[in-house]
């Protein structure tokens, strides 16, 4: 259709340029211009200067005709073509709507459960923004509402072990509320928050025991503080033991997925196609390898927490009393090292153990000391680090500062960190 329109324009332009009307108009205009000067247009006397000026003006007129006529006619012809012909898409709007309705199953899942996902901010009460005067954001994460009266589920590492801070929750509609930490299980990395609001949208909890490898799942949350973010993928494994991930004191078979779980996504829901939470987003090792806590394990935590609340006390296990460094880490097991080396050429071939830093809290001692996500800790105070337990032992030591040897890509570096007392 566009080619037909261009062909019509070309034909009309040629006819216009060859038209005697335009030439006669140009001649008449030339005569009138010479007449204004008081010169006979047919005179051949000593009027060379005027004749030269006339020829110059004639050339200028022709330039104007050649320049403006095609554009004017082009606009007119284009308008005529638009009136006569429809620029319809290849697929009719009604059919497109039907296909979108039939095949956009991810959008259907999100529409049914996104209202129950919240954005969590950890505010540093010691440092304030210069312009607004409000406490700066030290960290962020995600969570989801599990009771209409304001009970929210998230990861423990999102909200605890951060001194001099307060927790704020932003709902999907933009409203923000202060939150209190109610229940904590640091061993399983689960926690609940409470905000003083009622009649909230609640996330339905599914059954992780019925999951199969290859099932579609959707991860919702706030990666890198970008709230209301949706990523999708499949379940890569339903039985990834915590021992394979080097996580101490945890007897959990994690859900492995290739749905992107990035910093800030922690604590958000991993949802099946029925819109039910079947896991809590927990950690990412590298692109395409992320892990979530199975919802069946979460239900046990919630039941114990509810029993404690009925008795008038909060459910807190493994609550930290150690010094604070401000990182989230993962032990580099042989399986994880193999995956990292296969996906990155910057991993040293002789690296056999260490701890991967996959999140650094802004404003924390680790952040001030220069640690970055992706660094691999190999030594602390000249002691070899083989797993995350060694890092906890170093924090429990009485040393005022920690001299940490890290690998950043293929480069070995030293950073010095002064942990904060609890």
UniProtKB/Swiss-Prot annotation:
Superkingdom classification of source: Eukaryota
Domain PDZ as annotated: residue spans: 325-410
InterPro entries: PDZ, PDZ_6, PDZ_sf, Peptidase_S1_PA, Peptidase_S1C
One example of a Gene Ontology biological process annotation: positive regulation of apoptotic process
Pfam family, one: PDZ_6
Transit peptide: first to last position: 1-17
PROSITE patterns: PDZ
Membrane topology category: Single-pass membrane protein
CDD domains in UniProt: cpPDZ_HtrA-like
Record-linked PANTHER family: SERINE PROTEASE FAMILY S1C HTRA-RELATED (PTHR22939), SERINE PROTEASE HTRA2, MITOCHONDRIAL (PTHR22939:SF129)
Record-stated family: Belongs to the peptidase S1C family.
Protein name: Serine protease HTRA2, mitochondrial
Species name: Drosophila simulans (Fruit fly)
């Amino acid at each position: 259709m566009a080619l037909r329109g261009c062909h019509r324009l070309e034909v009309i332009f040629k006819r216009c340029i060859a038209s005697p009307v335009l030439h006669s108009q140009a001649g008449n205009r030339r005569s009138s211009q010479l007449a204004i000067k008081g010169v006979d247009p047919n005179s051949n006397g000593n009027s060379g200067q005027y004749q030269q000026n006339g020829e110059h003006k004639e050339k200028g007129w022709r330039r104007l005709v050649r320049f403006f006529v095609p554009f004017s006619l082009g606009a007119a012809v284009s308008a005529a073509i638009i009136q006569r012909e429809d620029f319809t898409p290849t697929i009719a709007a009604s059919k497109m709507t039907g296909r979108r309705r039939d095949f956009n199953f991810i959008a259907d899942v999100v529409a049914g459960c996104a209202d129950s996902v919240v954005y969590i901010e950890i505010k540093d009460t010691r440092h304030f923004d210069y312009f607004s005067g409000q406490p700066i954001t030290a960290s962020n994460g995600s969570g989801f509402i599990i009771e209409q009266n304001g009970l929210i589920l998230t990861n423990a590492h999102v909200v605890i072990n951060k001194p001099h801070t307060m927790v704020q929750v932003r709902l999907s509609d933009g409203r923000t509320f202060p939150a209190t930490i109610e229940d904590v299980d640091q061993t399983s990395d689960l926690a609940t928050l409470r905000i003083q609001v009622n009649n909230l949208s609640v996330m339905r909890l599914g059954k992780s025991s019925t999951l199969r490898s290859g099932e579609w799942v959707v991860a919702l949350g706030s990666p890198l503080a970008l709230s209301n973010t949706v990523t999708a993928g499949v379940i890569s494994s339903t039985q990834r033991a915590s021992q394979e991930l080097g996580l101490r004191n945890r007897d959990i078979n994690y859900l492995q997925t290739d749905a992107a779980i990035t910093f800030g996504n922690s604590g958000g829901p991993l949802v099946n196609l029925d819109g039910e939470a079947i896991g809590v987003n927990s950690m990412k090792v590298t692109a395409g390898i992320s892990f979530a806590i199975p919802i069946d394990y979460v239900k046990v935590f919630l039941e114990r927490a509810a029993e404690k609340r009925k008795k008038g006390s909060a459910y807190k296990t493994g609550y930290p009393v150690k010094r604070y460094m401000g990182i989230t880490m993962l032990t580099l097991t042989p399986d994880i090292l193999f995956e990292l080396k296969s996906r990155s050429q910057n991993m040293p071939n002789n690296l056999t153990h260490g701890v991967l830093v996959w999140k650094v809290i802004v404003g924390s001692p680790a952040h001030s000391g220069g640690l970055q996500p992706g660094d691999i800790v190999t030594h602390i105070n000249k002691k070899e680090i083989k797993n995350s337990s060694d890092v906890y032992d170093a924090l429990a030591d009485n040393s005022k500062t920690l001299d940490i040897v890290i690998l950043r890509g293929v480069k070995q570096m030293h950073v010095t960190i002064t942990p904060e007392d609890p």
